[in-house]
Amino acid sequence: MPFVVMITGIPGVGKSTITRLALRKARAKFRLVNFGDLMFEEAVRAGLVEHRDEMRKLNPNVQKELQMKAARRIVEMAKTEPILIDTHATIRTPVGYLLGFPKEVIEVINPNFIVIIEATPSEILGRRLRDLKRDRDVETEEQIQRHQDLNRAAAVSYAMHSNALIKIIENHEDKGLEEAVHELVEVLDLAVGEYD
């Protein structure tokens, strides 16, 4: 039976780092798939963008088409191995927030778990300011909190259309990265035996 875990969090929350470390410790051997990378590959193929950070500026209807193409690719992969999707539940665009997974897309992927990584707005802002490699929009702490609140609401919506369980993992500076990694490993190890 396919086992798919979606891991989400707004930019700067530490999602990719936690994911990478948890995959090393988990007993279940997941294939890590970055949903944005799959969408980006489709967008480049169509001549729509040259750089990944241009994706969020695309027309929302075009983004939805790219989402569906990426979802179908994930379903094929999940037939043979457990999949961990590194993604964003919502994407801030110039005209508003876009759901990372409209109803049709989440129904195609049908994840078992939706994991949300969170931190305080001040921690996220600090991490973003230290990460000079990415072209990120500047947001206030209030906007960052609003984005995290929207992610929670989106996760509930996704769970309604997929029966996924929701797990919230906090990645605070004082809590330690190790605890957040441990919590994700516990979720991933539920896939042990699903592909035997």
From Swiss-Prot:
Keywords in UniProt for this one?
ATP-binding, Cytoplasm, Kinase, Nucleotide-binding, Transferase
Class of this enzyme: transferase
Q: Which reaction does it catalyse?
A: AMP + ATP = 2 ADP
Q: Where in the cell is it found?
A: Cytoplasm
**What's the superkingdom here?**
Archaea
Binding-site residues, ATP:
G9, I10, P11, G12, V13, G14, K15, S16, T17
* InterPro entries for the chain: Adenylate_kinase_AdkA, P-loop_NTPase
| Pfam families (UniProt xref) | AAA_17
Enzyme Commission no: 2.7.4.3
Task: Provide the Gene Ontology terms for cellular component.
Answer: cytoplasm
One Gene Ontology term of the molecular function aspect: ATP binding
Q: Which family does it belong to?
A: Belongs to the archaeal adenylate kinase family.
The name under which this protein is listed is: Adenylate kinase
Organism of origin is Thermococcus onnurineus (strain NA1)
